[in-house]
Structure formats: C-alpha cells, structure tokens
Amino acid sequence: MSMQDPIADMLTRIRNGQAANKVSVKMPSAKLKVAIAKLLKEEGYIADYAVADEAKPELEITLKYFQGQPVVETIQRVSRPGLRIYKGKNELPKVMGGLGVAIVSTSKGLMTDRAARLAGMGGEVICYVA
C-alpha cells in the first residue's frame, strides 16, 4: 500500500526518533523532504541530514539534543492532502510568539514564515516546528 502523506510520515519519524532518544532516523527520500530537512538544519532543529544515493534514495536525519532533551519540542503537520491550508503574507502565523517557525511552500520554494513575510509572499503552510 502506498503512503498517503509522506511529509506527515517524515515529521512523525522525527518526533518518534527524538522521543526514543535515537541518534538518527532514516526514511525514503524526496525533493520536498530534503528541502524541509535543509530548513530544519538552517533553523537549528536538527544536527545534519544526508541523502544516500542508491537504487532507492534514503534520507538520513541526524537528530539534535540539548542537555539530553530533544531540541524539537513540537513538530506538527498543518496542511495535509485532505485539507490544504493557504495563508497570505499578512495571515502567516507566528509559532509560539515567534520562537518557533512555520514552514511555508511559496512560488519561490520552501521557506520559513519569517522569510516569507520579508519576501512579501504567502503560500501553503506545511508544518509548525518549535
């Protein structure tokens, strides 16, 4: 059976991996997943990521901890295949009062809510991370 929501699966693997204090998590790779992992690394929520070039490419995310606690407090899917959530530039949410980030898919690619506001763009809200 095929996966209905690969992004939700990725976020769940990260959440479960940190709950179990794993060093890293592996999942099937896709361009959108790699773009999300890149943003998470830039924002400091994960330590690193790598794509293994094989017959079936695999994305490995190295999780990040601070004083034994997971850096990612919450990671939540917002827009999903059954209910897409789009927000304009003035409607983009501030996650945890600006302490977290919302990952937004815009016409210029994936970016954080802060970057989208600076660029004056709205888009599909993929997930919240705090």
UniProtKB/Swiss-Prot annotation:
It comes from the Bacteria. The keyword Ribonucleoprotein applies. InterPro entries: Ribosomal_uS8, Ribosomal_uS8_CS, Ribosomal_uS8_sf. One of its GO terms (molecular function) is rRNA binding. One of its GO terms (biological process) is translation. PROSITE patterns: RIBOSOMAL_S8. Pfam families: Ribosomal_S8 (PF00410). GO terms for cellular component: ribonucleoprotein complex; ribosome. Keywords: Ribonucleoprotein, Ribosomal protein, RNA-binding, rRNA-binding. The keyword Transport does not apply. SUPFAM superfamilies: Ribosomal protein S8. PANTHER family: 40S RIBOSOMAL PROTEIN S15A. One of the primary rRNA binding proteins, it binds directly to 16S rRNA central domain where it helps coordinate assembly of the platform of the 30S subunit. Belongs to the universal ribosomal protein uS8 family. Part of the 30S ribosomal subunit. Contacts proteins S5 and S12. This is Small ribosomal subunit protein uS8.
